[in-house]
């Protein structure tokens, strides 16, 4: 038991090496002593180290080295930054709240979206309008009511020009969140 504790202490560096321990408690036979010293000598003698000559690359070797052809990739202009012309508008007739993903993906890509919620129930239509309001707020766009249940979601670079009609009380109350 003491031997195991002593070996652990030596391993952790809390005690001196094995040579003091062996000389105090154990007297090895002459054959064992010779083999132990022979093992220690083998451990101490490192292998000879050779220096490796480094070759410096010649200018001809660098020219002969294969290089893959490089084709530059031109980045397409982002549709959000494009203000020169409007190419498309998406009209979506959602049937359930699950269609919100399609609305969000189109608007995120910079495409104005006309959302017609006439085919939806009132509760789901309100949820979808709330989602759309958050979407345009997060992407700095705008949302405008076209008719009672039809809305236009436009990105920040699109300006909508139209009549500034006052909406009647019955139309305004449908999506009034106050």
Swiss-Prot record:
Disulfide cysteine pairs (residue numbers): none
GO biological process: division septum assembly; FtsZ-dependent cytokinesis
Compositional bias (Basic and acidic residues): 19-45
Family: Belongs to the SepF family.
Function noted in UniProt: Cell division protein that is part of the divisome complex and is recruited early to the Z-ring. Probably stimulates Z-ring formation, perhaps through the cross-linking of FtsZ protofilaments. Its function overlaps with FtsA.
Summary of subunit composition and partner proteins: Homodimer. Interacts with FtsZ.
Matches recorded under HAMAP family: SepF
Name of the protein this chain belongs to: Cell division protein SepF
Organism: Arthrobacter sp. (strain FB24)
Gene name of this polypeptide: sepF
């Amino acid at each position: 038991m003491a031997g195991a504790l002593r070996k652990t202490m030596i391993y952790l560096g809390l005690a001196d090496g094995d040579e003091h321990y062996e000389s105090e408690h154990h007297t090895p036979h002459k054959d064992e002593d010779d083999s132990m010293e022979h093992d220690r000598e083998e451990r101490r003698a490192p292998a000879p180290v050779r220096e490796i000559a480094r070759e410096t690359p010649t200018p001809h070797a660098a020219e002969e080295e294969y290089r893959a052809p490089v084709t530059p990739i031109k980045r397409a202009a982002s549709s959000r930054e494009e203000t020169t012309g409007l190419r498309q508008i998406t009209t979506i007739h959602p049937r359930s709240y699950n269609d919100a993903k399609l609305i969000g993906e189109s608007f995120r890509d910079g495409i104005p979206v006309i959302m017609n919620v006439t085919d939806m129930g009132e509760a789901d239509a309100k949820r979808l309008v709330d989602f759309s309001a958050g979407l345009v707020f997060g992407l700095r766009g705008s949302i405008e009511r076209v008719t009672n249940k039809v809305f236009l979601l436009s990105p920040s670079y699109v300006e909508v020009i139209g009549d500034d009609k006052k909406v009647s009380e019955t139309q305004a109350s449908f999506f009034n969140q106050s």
